[in-house]
From Swiss-Prot:
Homodimer. Keywords: Hydrolase, Nuclease, Virulence. Its EC number is 3.1.-.-. It is an enzyme of class 3 (hydrolase). InterPro entries: VapD, Virulence_VapD/CRISPR_Cas2. The keyword RNA-binding does not apply. This is Endoribonuclease VapD. It comes from Dichelobacter nodosus (Bacteroides nodosus).
């Protein structure tokens, strides 16, 4: 599986997207979900498959959103080989 992680500059996001700016994150989530990514935490999304073409489609889609292009500080994609969820252990469940 692959992951996409990004960081948006809030001041730029407010300027180019508007208020409430957190709606931008919902829009990004919808776009990525349609391509095959699931939100994990923060601004990290995991693909449902092991295909770099899915990553390419996601990056291509995001690059067509003007307010995203103007607001993104950093965006990276990487391969995830092992993914372990320790939430239940930390919460004592």
């Amino acid at each position: 599986m692959y992951a996409i992680a990004f960081d948006l500059e809030i001041a730029e996001l407010k300027k180019h997207y508007g208020e409430p700016y957190n709606g931008a994150y919902l829009e990004i989530g919808k776009e990525l979900k349609a391509i095959g990514f699931e939100w994990t935490q923060g601004s990290v999304y995991l693909s449902n498959d092991n295909n770099l073409a899915t990553v390419y489609r996601a990056i291509s889609t995001l690059s067509k959103i003007d307010w995203f292009k103007s607001s993104v500080r950093d965006i990276r994609a990487f391969k995830v080989e092992d993914w372990s969820d320790f939430t239940a252990i930390v919460k004592g469940a």
